[in-house]
Regions:
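Conserved catalytic-core motifs of GNAT/GCN5-like acyltransferases
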Residues: 169, 187-205
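Conserved acyl-donor/pantetheine-binding loop and adjacent beta-alpha core of acyl/acetyltransferases
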Residues: 78-135, 195-199
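Conserved beta-hairpin
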Residues: 61-77
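Conserved GNAT acetyl-CoA-binding A-motif
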Residues: 130-131, 159-173
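Conserved acetyl-CoA-binding loop-helix of GNAT-fold acetyltransferases
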Residues: 138, 144-158
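A short helix-loop-beta-strand connector motif used in the catalytic cores of GNAT acetyltransferases and
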Residues: 45-66, 132
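Conserved active-site alpha-helix within GNAT-family acetyltransferase domains
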Residues: 174-191
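A short beta-loop-alpha structural element at the N-terminal edge
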Residues: 3-20, 24-30
Length: 223
């Protein structure tokens, strides 16, 4: 049984760990940063710091949730409310973003910020009133156990519906994730290829319609 609750600042380190391991060699991050590191340990440490800053910068204006099993956080998600402003450079600086400059350099950080905006541009343009799924991460040791689907169906979708949201969008960059989101009721509406540091990365945009009276499994599961 997974219990869901809104994350607090004390949870950010654990969420960063989950995110770093879930997205450690995700094409979206690999193409931007991996070549700046000499070994996997230093790259993984940097990824954890990057995700911690991202969570801190976005959680102030948006909602971050965790799934808890036997007292341990095993899944996490960050969703952005279209009525709230997106985190900007100032928000990232306040969240400790300057600590990300070494060893990759400031220009690479700023370039990644713009790269991220471009990656989600189709979602913002075609579905400007939609909620946006920024992060969905699960414990690697429990992948395949339904944690990601549970977070979507039992926590995020009921929450967005309760807030009056009618759409939820996201992007992904792997074939495996494409299948996962289709299985969970999302529809792909855009496909592009992004280029970064000589690498080509597939970028797929998805949207789910959330009717006002959509029947979900976990309407009362969020604490």
């Amino acid at each position: 049984m997974i219990d869901y609750r809104e994350a607090g600042t004390k949870d950010f380190n654990r969420i960063a760990q989950l995110s770093a391991k879930s997205f450690g060699h995700y094409p979206y991050f690999d193409c931007a940063f991996h070549n700046a590191f000499k070994n996997e340990e230093s790259y993984n440490t940097y990824m954890e710091k990057l995700h911690r800053v991202n969570i801190k910068a976005n959680a102030q204006q948006n909602k971050c949730f965790v799934g808890v099993k036997d007292g341990e956080i095993v899944s996490a998600a960050l969703i952005q409310n279209p009525a709230k402003k997106k985190a900007d450079v100032e928000d990232y600086v306040k969240a400790g973003g300057l600590s990300l400059v070494y060893p990759v350099g400031l220009s690479k950080i700023l370039d990644f910020f713009h790269f991220s905006e471009d990656a989600r541009a189709d979602c913002d343009r075609k579905h400007p009133s939609a909620w946006y799924l920024e992060v969905l991460a699960v414990d690697n040791s429990m992948k395949g156990c339904g944690l990601g689907s549970g977070m979507l169906q039992d926590c995020l979708i009921p929450y967005v519906q309760k807030q009056g949201g009618q759409e939820l969008t996201l992007i992904t960059n792997t074939e495996g994730n494409r299948k996962f989101y289709v299985k969970n009721g999302f529809q792909e509406f855009s496909q592009r290829t992004l280029e970064k540091n000589g690498q080509r990365v597939g970028n797929w945009s998805f949207c789910m319609d959330i009717p006002k009276h959509r029947c979900t499994r976990g309407t009362n599961r969020i604490k």
